[in-house]
Amino acid sequence: MRALGGDRLPLCKSCMEGTRQTILQEIENKVKSADSHNVIWIRGPPGVGKSALAASISTRLEGKGRHVISFRFDRTQSTTITTDALWRVIACDFVRQYPSLRQHLVEGSRGHNSSDIDHLFKSLIETPLSALDNVPHEELPVIVVDALDECGGLRHDSSGWDDYEGLLHTLKRWVQVDHLKKFKLVITSRPENRITQIFPDSISTHVNIPSGSDVKPGDSASNDIRVFLKSQLDAMGVDEAWVVRAIDHLVPRAGGIFIWATTVADFLRLNPKVRFSALELKDDSDGLETLYSLYSTVITTLFGRGLREEEIKAVTSVMGAMTFAKQPLDDDALIKLPRVKSRDMLEFI
């Protein structure tokens, strides 16, 4: 079966202990229910912790005896972490769990043209899995695919788009083919329109991770940020009263964006009280806006106040773009950022 395998990346780090309990229980309940939709889509903007949720639900299910097949896309490795690799990895894992499928997969893989993703899916997934009709729902593997929207990389060329469209086209079969409907598929991504077209909420379960103005004081998303920040600030050796005041100031500004909270914790770690005084954040409800404000504060604090305002804005824009892209960006991409404006500014950065 080795020839059938594809490249695979491990899932990211799980959620911190004690956080995301409400949403994890919701996902687990949907996975266990034979009557709910077979596709569970965890949706949210960058930085809210979708990948951590994918890792946590995998660990949680495996800890309760459920076999999980996981796969993670990464836009920086779009030439190897492909749709072809996804279905080959899943096929191989099914064979390890159900050796009787081996012959189906070996025969289906013969003469396969990697450009024909529909044939690959039918021969390695759709047809073989029909042999598992008699397996009880609670014993079937759960498939977890993280960062679905990163398939195809930045999609600057036709190959990236072709791979992404091939992925969506084959995934659509998951809700169309009767015998595939018994297999639970958990996916994570940003709320992209193309994915919504494939998986509208009429045929899939949408688990929306709130952010910005959707995060209210006292709700689970806000409390999760609070738990995370308290654990980080407590470890810095400062007095409890200061920790409480700092958390009360920071939590509303996070807007449910975990990458914001992580950046704050990293920034404060070396000199908490002094650096906290530099966090003159705007009172925005949108976590993404406060993230840019935070970057600006970090840059000013770390590099001194000799930078001009336009330079701070440009550096902040570049840092933000690379954070959300999760990879280095080339000059051609960065020059298009509105705050960079010129080659001279880009060279300065």
Feature names for model-found ranges:
Residues M1-I349:
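Conserved NB-ARC/NACHT P-loop NTPase core of NLR-like innate immune receptors
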